[in-house]
Amino acid sequence: GSMLRSTWNAGALPFLADPKTTHAWGGAMAIRREVFSQANLEEVWNKAVSDDLTLTMGVRKLGLTLEFVPQCIAVSYESSTLRETLEFTNRQSLISRIYFPPLWWATAIGHACANLLMAYGCASVLIWSATGAAAYLIGSTCLLLLPLQLVNAVWLFSTVKDLLPVQIQTDVQFLRWHYVMTAPLASVMTLVNTVHSAATRQITWRGITYELRSPSETIVVSRID
């Protein structure tokens, strides 16, 4: 669960490096006091469950830009079961859909296309095996996406590693192939997150269930005392 969660998180770094989709990262972000006031973030945060993405949209509305500083990436060590990882990624996906739709759409379209083509490739192989119809072998070429996905993961790992603070690069290098081999699973999980976040507006965090009605309206649905 922890490895999959880490791989899933690492997938956000290319979006951080792209000026069109870059956004504040809750683990390490800074803003000038005067910009904070101009964006009215104190009031916005009183009604939101996301601090980083509301900050992102607030700054963009002022016509200002966000700067991604790789040296400020904060690394945390935490265990996570598969269930906890799924809950976390579902929550983050829904938050991005409500607060930063461009990021959600970019992620949704990319992973949906990749995974649907892979599924089509698998189905083509099964149908060819059952019927012997050679035409389905053409569809099976979609499975070439898997090795391409692994090659991309190798390239992305090297790029991401270079962005991290020097003192932890050795630890990350030790897990190189763990990241690469869990990349396809992280992509499938992202598709699951997309479907889940498209079907609901509720998240549960520390025993409290919230409904995200809009970027400026969040209500408490229930809480476990």
Predicted region positions:
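Membrane-embedded multi-pass helical conduit in multi-pass membrane proteins
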Residues: 107-201
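Short, isolated positions in well-ordered beta-strands
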Residues: 210-211
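Short, surface-exposed, low-complexity cationic segments
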Residues: 217-225
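Catalytic donor/gating beta->alpha subdomain of glycosyltransferases that bind UDP-sugars
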Residues: 1-8, 37, 42-104
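Long helical/loop segments within the catalytic core of UDP-sugar-dependent glycosyltransferases
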Residues: 1-43, 86, 90-93, 179-192, ...
